[in-house]
Amino acid sequence: MVIVTDSNFLDAAGTLRKGLLYCDFVAIDFEFLGLDVSAISLHDTVESRYQILRDNVIKYRPCQLGLTLFKQKSNRAYKADTYSVPLFQRFGDNDTSISLPSMRFLVKNKFNLNQVFMDGVEFCTRKEFKKFERALLAGTAASYLSREVKSQIELLKVMVHEKCYQSTSYHITHRTDEPMQKIPLKMKPNSSVSLRMPRNLSSVEKYMIIYELTKAFPQFLFTCDEKQQNLHVKNISDDYLKEKDNLERARARCSESVKGVSAILQVVHMTGKLVVGHNSLLDAMYMYHYFFSHLPANYQMFKDKFNALFPRIMDTKLLAQALRFELPGVGDSLENLGDYFGSDKSDKTVPPELRGFIEPWMNPLEDESENVYHNAGFDSYVTGEVFLKLAHIYINRRNNFKNEILDFDRIYQYLEAPILNRLPFQLMDVGCCYLTGDDSKGFRPDVITIVRRDRVAIEEDEFRYLEKALGTLMATYQFDIEWSKNKKELFLATNSPGSYAFLCEKFSNDSSLAPLDELDSGKKWTFEQRQTAWRSFKNRGVGIGINAKRIRAQNQATKIQRAMEI
C-alpha cells in the first residue's frame, strides 16, 4: 500500500494518473468523520432515505479515500496498486461535525487521525476550484491564506532583496512592492541563494508563497528542497525560462495543490473506468458531493447526475447476495468476504490465478502496517479482490463453465445486465438503487397495520407503552413502529418473515389490538401460515400512505386465504 499525504501528493499524482489510464477497473472506499443512523427507519421511502443520507454527507466530511487500481496481465492473472489517502480540506467551507462514537471506532481500528489533520490531502468541488482560479487570475488568491502566512510572504520578499541585491536603506525600509517595480534584481549566472521557509506549511500554502514571490520577482525561479525547509532562488535564464512561462508554471502548481485529490477522481471520470465499491451508495454520494458538486435536492436528480459522471459502477454486496446459496455462511459484509477469500477455504471456488494475495502492479509494497479493515486503502483492495473472485464464481457457475480465469472484458459483459449501476439500499423495501432506471422491488415483508378492535383512536400513552414494550420484546430483531396521522393505526415494519409472523401472532392474540387484515376478513391465521405467506402487496409508488392501507390489508387477507386452501 502506498500512503499518499499532502507532503508527497504532487509527486505521487503522476503515477496515480498513469495507473488510472491503463488499469481495467478501480475499487474505491471512503472513511467519514461520522455516520448518524438514528434517523433511519424501515418505513423510509427512497426519497426520505436519500434525504437522511444526504444530511449525513453534508454534516460529516470524508477523512480518508482508498483507491486500488487493478490490471489484468497477459497471463490473465491480476496485479493491483493500492493508495491510502488521508483527506483534509483547509480552504473550503469550515462548517463540519465530528461524531465521537465514529472517531472511537476508527481509532480502535488503528486509524491515524493525526495524519488526517496534519498531513491530509486537499480536495474541492468544481465550483470551489473555479472560484479559486478566478481569485488567482484576479490577483486576490492571497485572501485564502492566514494573516501569519501573508506576513511570512512579505518577510520573504524583503529577504530576497537582501540576498539578491545590495539595496540602499531607502529600498529596505519602504514597502517591498515599490523597489520590485523599479529596481531590476539580478544574480550572477549559475548561482543561487537559499531562504528559510516557515515550518508546518500545507502544500497549498507552500505553493501560494512561491506563486506570490514569482509574481513579485518573475526573473527568479523559486524551488523547495526535498525536505521543504529551504527555498532556493536562481535566475530563470539558467533554465532557459521566460518570465511568462515561469509565472504560469508557478500558477499551475498552485492550482494543482488546491485541487488535490479531486483531480485524481476527475481522471476516473474522464477515462470512464469501471468503479467498484462495497455497499457503496454512501461512498457514491460522498464522492459526488465533495469532489464534483453539491448533492442535488432530490433522489432522482442524484441518480441522473451521478450516472452522468460515472456511467459504470458495480457493487460487490449485490454479487455476494446473489451467491448466498453458493457460499452459505459467508454473508455479504466486506470483512466476512475478505476473510473467506483470504483463506484456503476459498481455493476450490476460484481459479488458481486468483488464489491468495494479488501482487503489486507498478508500485512496490511500501507499507503493510495499515492493512487493516476500516482503513480505506485496505478496504478498497479487499473490495476489488472480492469483486474478481465473486464475479468468477457467479459467471462460471451460472454458465456451467469450468473453474477458469476469464478475460476482464468477458466479466464485464456477463455482469452488465444483472449488476451494473445498481447500488444496495440497507433496511429498505427496495431491491437496490438503479442509477439508469427504476429501482427494483424489495423482498421485505409487508408493513403490518395494527388497530384497536373497537376501531377507536390509540392514545399516546398506549402508543409509547407499545413502542417501549416491543423494543424490549424484539431485542436484536430489526423493526420500526409508526403512528398514523388519524391516531387509529400503528404501522409495524420488519425485515424478516419470522419477525413478521411473530408480531402478527402477538397482536392476533391481543385482547384490545389486532392486525387490520384479520379484522377486515374475519379470519385468523397461524404463525406458520403467516411465515409462508408474508408477502401480499407491493407497490413502490404507494409506499405506506394512508390510502393504501385498506388495499394492503385486503390483498394480504386474500393471499393468506389462498395459501390456506392449497
Curated annotation (Swiss-Prot):
GO terms for biological process: mRNA catabolic process; nuclear-transcribed mRNA poly(A) tail shortening; piRNA processing; priRNA 3'-end processing; reproductive process; RNA surveillance; siRNA 3'-end processing. It is an enzyme of class 3 (hydrolase). The keyword Magnesium applies. Its EC number is 3.1.13.-. It comes from the Eukaryota. One of its GO terms (molecular function) is RNA binding. GO terms for cellular component: cytoplasm; endoplasmic reticulum; nucleus; P granule. This is 3'-5' exoribonuclease parn-1.
